[in-house]
Amino acid sequence: KTTNTFASVNDDEKPREECGVVGIYGDPEASRLCSLALHALQHRGQEGAGIVAVHDNLFHQVNGVGLVSDVFNEAKLSELPGSCAIGHVRYSTAGHSKLVNVQPFVAGYRFGSVAVAHNGNFVNYRSLRAKLEDNGSIFNTTSDTEVVLHLIATSKHRPFLLRVVDACENLKGAYSLVFLTEDKLVAVRDFGFRPLVMGRRKNGAVVFASETCALDLIDATYEREVNPGEVVVVDHTGIQSLCLVTHQEPKQCIFEHIYFALPNSVVFGRSVYESRRKFGEILATESPVECDVVIAVPDSGVVAALGYAAKAGVPFQQGLIRSHHVGRTFIEPSQKIRDFGVKLKLFPVRGVLEGKRVVVVDDSIVRGTTSSKIVRLIKEAGAKEVHMRIACPPIVASCYYGVDTPSKEELISNRMDVEEIRKFIGSDSLAFLPLDTLKSLLEDDAPNYCYACFSGKYPVQPENLNPTASMSLTGTMFQWQFETY
């Protein structure tokens, strides 16, 4: 077993995004464009990458462990002919990190073949898998995504789209899915937990991606989101929109705006950059402190720190420099090495920090151990005072919708109040963005977001969770609405 030690020593505090998906229909360079789009989504998963393309009704596949640049080169891309392709970058939330679990997955069934790439997590995966295995299904991976293929294969319907609908009726949790058949590209979204957008290139090629930054990189114009509860079908006849659930109430992951998405993306119809800037501004308004300089924990705290500094009228400076060159070093972890982790990733700028009252803006605190190391690092560089400002509310509950978070017991905000956390990390003051304030910033969109990690109230009931600690959504009957455009 190998472990990405250096990636974990700094980023172990952060919830890890689950995956990123791409789908392209109608471009002769589909696989190459797909690989470029996956580069733009690399932040959503670094454990593996894969692309499946279709040419003359034959599926061609290249999957590998590691970064997109590790998996794909010109020789590999030449093995992926065709004008239609789907791609995936993986961070495992259900299933182990090994090649067999790297998506997209491809399977044959009675009426053809299908490939799938999934961003999210099925909360009823275990019970679905057990039921399928009882009925004779044989699984090749430990990924929750494989159940979708089995559900499609065992559906009693013949048309592929009806098989997809049949499968979705059994799924609970978070899923943004792209499917590829011999002649169709299909995108499906659930309650809207995870983002999925649609764009178009100048030659008419249709593109789906987890974030708009992927569209930007391949010169595709953003058109709209795939709506919660929607299936979008692309084939030689054009584009059809199929509504699975009428008036589906979205439950969008707020952490996309706090941490996961790139700042240059538009997610859930909002600029991620503007969201983070406003989070920083409101922190400066609601939790001011006398200071000489504002710095960020790079990279995810930068935009919020800019907002804080602008509102407070205090200079923003780079007090911490992040190294991007040690994260792919694989060695067996040891505590001695872990103790050097933050120093390997973050280098303090003594000239910025020495003798100063420093505000440090970060996007979140999870376990608290990395925050304590950062505070110590800044004080060792000569800072007079260190004031931590966190651009999200305290995280008190785990996520079951495709984000890798620690258990509830490991979350420091579930065990300590703010003052206890301040003492634990060693800062001179500590303040979080209040949940009510966060909701007020979202205005009319506030009811459309999931705040389970801040409240413990789950919009879709996870398996093996105390029902009294969550809310359930009922009414999963699928209805059809057709719109052609």
UniProtKB/Swiss-Prot annotation:
Protein origin, superkingdom: Eukaryota
Binding of Mg(2+), residues: 300, 362-363
Protein name from the UniProt record: Amidophosphoribosyltransferase, chloroplastic
Subcellular location, principal: plastid
Keyword Transferase included in the entry's annotation: yes
Location within or outside the cell: Plastid, Chloroplast
GO-annotated molecular function: 4 iron, 4 sulfur cluster binding; amidophosphoribosyltransferase activity; metal ion binding
EC number(s) from the headed UniProt entry: 2.4.2.14
Organism, scientific name: Vigna aconitifolia
Transit peptide stretch: 1-18
Residues where [4Fe-4S] cluster binds: 253, 399, 450, 453
